[in-house]
Amino acid sequence: DISQLNELYPAVRDQNPYGTCWAFASLMALETTLKPETNIDFSEDHMSINNNFSMTQNDGGEYTMAIAYLASWTGPVLEEDDPYGDGYSPEGLEAVVHLQEAQVLESKNYDNIKKSVFLYGGVQSSLYMEMPDSRSTSIYYDENKYSYCYIGPEKPNHDIVIIGWDDTYPASNFTFEPEGDGAFICANSWGEEFGDRGVFYVSYYDSNIGVHNVIYTGIEGTDNYDNIYQTDLCGWVGQIGYDRDYAYFANVYTANDDESLEAVAFYSVAPDSSYEIYIVEDFKDEASFSTRRLLTKGTFSNAGYYTVKIPEKVNLEQGGRYAIVVYI
């Protein structure tokens, strides 16, 4: 029931006047993962301005930008430290939590989406919204029943958060009746004047709902690690194919201090993947890769961004060069 869900989830917010639905959806999904133990309001302003892609708040965005911002520990920061709507983000703000895992769910796998809503509270997903804001109308939206269903070729242009579902929601409640009953209950970012205090129904048969789905499943305190080594703040922006279903990739780093390697974080771009993580100590050149040593291995059920803890810490000397190699 929408009225009950409104009591359990973060208050619906208003992205007006910017094209920042992606930031609102990702941070609401992040906040729902932390509830009910932690009630926190993250800053959409900070994410949308400090997005590492040199894009403005009116350029739009999507979930890979949100994951990149969070995975790099650029944020999130608190709303009170960077309030929304002024087009300005103060310098020097630091993340108040660290994202260590975000899973990308398989397209249109509704059982997996429902399970994730049950476990984590909210799933970030996307729609094609013919209407640009709450002041507009659309032939695909019923203002009285708060129901939306678009069936057609248009690609997603708006992010929302799936916070519930109703398998018996009547198909007759939609302006264009789909082939069956059922709807996801979604939180929008157009303020409380849209839908039922910001929440609405989206048919299971909508062309885009459930195609792109993200859950933020690993959130830790900022004291979890002393340092993060990274070379690319844009994260996963795409992939190219190979003539095989496996690949190696590696990065070379120089230790800033005497410290220990405790975890390795990377993207897996396909579901049901297995991985092996290696280290090359005292790295000199390409020939050094032959000395790689296995640290750990495992599997991922879903695509996404993962942090894998190393069973035995590896001591690193200040100024020493080392390579991390992943086989996946």
Task: Give the predicted meaning of each segment.
Residues 1-262, 270-298:
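Catalytic-core signature of thiol
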Residues 127, 268, 326-328:
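Conserved "cap/hinge" positions at secondary-structure junctions
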Residues 264, 306-328:
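Short, well-structured beta-strand segments enriched in hydrophobic/aromatic residues
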